[in-house]
Every structure is written in C-alpha cells, then in structure tokens.
C-alpha cells in the first residue's frame, strides 16, 4: 500500500479535486508520505486524509498540503521559505523540492528530532530546522519570500507579516475551533493585501516549547 502506483492514485485524486500546479504534484509524487507517519499507519498514508503523528498533532490532508503549496509557490520558485510548524516534516519536504532554502520551526522537540532524521534520509540539504515558538518566526533569517503556517492562530501574528519580503506571500489558516479561514497575504512595499479563500480545519497554533 506504499507503492508508487498507490502514490500516483492519490495524485490523480488531487488533480480531480482541482490541484493544477504540475510542480506541486510532481513534488508530492516524489516525496514518500508513508515515511512521515508511524509504521502502523503507513498503509493509510496515501489516503486523502489527515493522520495523527502524536503529541495531539497531525500530518495534514494531502489536498490541503497541495492547495497551500500551490498558493505559496504558483508562478515562481521562492528562494527563502519559512515554515511555521514542521510537525512530521512532510510539508517541509514538499517545500524543499520547490524552493531554494527552507527554514522550519517546530515547538515540540520529539517531533522535530524525527523530522530531522527524515530530512537526512531524503538528503534534503536545503532545510534548516530549529526548536522554537513558531509565532515569532525566525527573524534572524528573514525576510522571507514565502511563509507557510501549518497551525491556526486566532489572529495572524504581526511578527510573521514583518518577516515577509517585498513581493512575498504568507499562507496561513486563521481562526479558532471550526471557524478557521485559509488566508493569503501579499506584500507590496509597505502595503499588505489580504485574501480569504476557504474554510479549513487545523490544530491551533500554540506558544512555548515542549521538550
């Protein structure tokens, strides 16, 4: 159930659901999702559903991964990408295939250590990762051409908007409980354009670090 054929069936399902960016679909074909979940769940890795990864966190539904990546990377190859919430590392790995350098922050140490081992196994040499409260971003490495947030704050953190480079994009779920909206912010000089796209469901973006 983890064969390339199984992976390709998922890709065709994503196409039918409206994902059109070929670079995104190719990255999701090449990155094996089953290595980002526990072995007991590997047989479900290519279902279009979120799966638990421990510590009350999930690996996102493939459609959502594809949709957010398409919004972030469509029409260009960002050089510097910040990801807030590495989780299993799956979304990070997809971004690494579509950008020059990915900086990812994760607040739960055991998840981050597992993710780093997966990056090494996949020879993803363009990923830098650190244990941190993601709400603060990674200001020492900014500004970023693109920022993706994989957990939902109640409001968009101003610190992340400040780390967005001119011409850059931020893709983020915003809201609490079941009232979350997927938003895209685009910076043009001092102006930031905000778009609300569709309802989504993510774990909340929490503060602090768990060791």
Swiss-Prot record:
The active site is at residue 60. Its EC number is 2.1.1.77. It is an enzyme of class 2 (transferase). Signal peptide: none annotated. GO terms for cellular component: cytoplasm. CDD domains: AdoMet_MTases. It catalyses: [protein]-L-isoaspartate + S-adenosyl-L-methionine = [protein]-L-isoaspartate alpha-methyl ester + S-adenosyl-L-homocysteine. GO terms for molecular function: protein-L-isoaspartate (D-aspartate) O-methyltransferase activity. It is found in: Cytoplasm. Keywords: Cytoplasm, Methyltransferase, S-adenosyl-L-methionine, Transferase. InterPro entries: PCMT (IPR000682), SAM-dependent_MTases_sf (IPR029063). Its main location: cytoplasm. GO terms for biological process: methylation; protein modification process; protein repair. It comes from the Bacteria. Belongs to the methyltransferase superfamily. L-isoaspartyl/D-aspartyl protein methyltransferase family. Catalyzes the methyl esterification of L-isoaspartyl residues in peptides and proteins that result from spontaneous decomposition of normal L-aspartyl and L-asparaginyl residues. It plays a role in the repair and/or degradation of damaged proteins. This is Protein-L-isoaspartate O-methyltransferase. It comes from Hahella chejuensis (strain KCTC 2396). The lineage of its organism: Bacteria, Pseudomonadati, Pseudomonadota, Gammaproteobacteria, Oceanospirillales. The gene is pcm.
